[in-house]
A protein has these predicted regions:
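Terminal transmembrane helix and immediately flanking juxtamembrane interfaces
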Residues: 1-259
Length: 259
């Protein structure tokens, strides 16, 4: 981490984890504390993963860019990449919700207590028309339909974003950029956050395998990263593009000031 070499190859590691991570379910114990969705890590970090990413990565990007140029405009331009990723995340969530509601159906289980037969150990299901997924699940009924794992999508996007935004720190230090204790501490927090996201990704793949929804979610996360960082941002800084991480920051004079 903190190097361009790590940034160039991290997406391959992440793709391998998504493809082969579900195989870990053959060895993990379903009695583990991580096999429960109510675990503290899932509740405290997974449900608000984008917020944690914005707090630590946003603070690091702002402090790094401002310590170089002392320019609020430059700092805001680099921070705008997080805004773009956030809009993309919210937009994908809305689209996925529409797809799930359009392709899925709500069912109410009929237990044998109500005098209904049970087939192969499973109660019959009564179709409920017109119910959305949120309303269906909220009423304790069963939703079946086309789904994409939003958790895997978010974790993949956050992992790749953290790797991209922090990869400039190594070259920045090599060129003599000013780096006080707060900047180094924020970089350390970003490293810890990336490790946590990878760990949660492995936990979801191992303890809650779901094919192909997790594969599709991971693919969407990787495609979003590639479209932004390997596509649009390569056009360079302009009124319609924030540019890649490090642009305008990695040209340092001998005295530690930007050219």
């Amino acid at each position: 981490m903190g190097s361009s070499h790590f940034r160039r190859h991290f997406h391959l590691l992440l793709s391998g984890l998504i493809m082969f991570g579900p195989a870990l379910s053959l060895w993990v114990s379903q009695h583990s504390i991580f096999a429960k969705r109510t675990h503290f890590l899932y509740r405290a970090f997974l449900r608000s993963g984008w917020g944690w990413t914005c707090i630590f990565v946003g603070s690091f990007v702002f402090l790094l860019s401002f310590s170089v140029g002392r320019s609020l405009v430059l700092s805001l331009r680099h921070l705008s990449r997080l805004v773009v990723a956030g809009v993309l995340w919210v937009g994908f969530r809305k689209i996925l919700d529409v797809l799930e509601n359009a392709t899925g159906s709500c069912y109410e289980p009929l237990s044998a207590v109500d005098g209904q037969p049970v087939v192969n150990g499973q109660p019959l299901l009564l179709l409920r028309e017109g119910a959305s997924k949120q309303l269906c699940v909220g009423n304790g009924m069963l939703w079946r339909g086309y789904e994409v794992s939003e958790d895997i999508f978010l974790l993949c996007l956050c992992c790749l974003l953290v790797a991209e935004e922090t990869a400039v720190f190594g070259p920045y230090l090599t060129l003599g950029g000013p780096s006080g204790a707060p900047l180094r501490l924020l970089f350390l927090f970003c490293v810890i956050l990336l490790g946590l996201w990878v760990f949660l990704l492995l936990c979801l793949l191992a303890y809650f395998p779901s094919f192909p929804t997790q594969i599709i979610g991971g693919a969407l996360g990787c495609l979003s990263w590639r479209g932004l960082y390997q596509g649009w941002y390569r056009l360079g800084p302009s009124w319609y593009c924030p540019g890649r991480p490090g642009v305008g920051l990695l040209t340092i004079k001998e005295g530690g000031k930007p050219e």
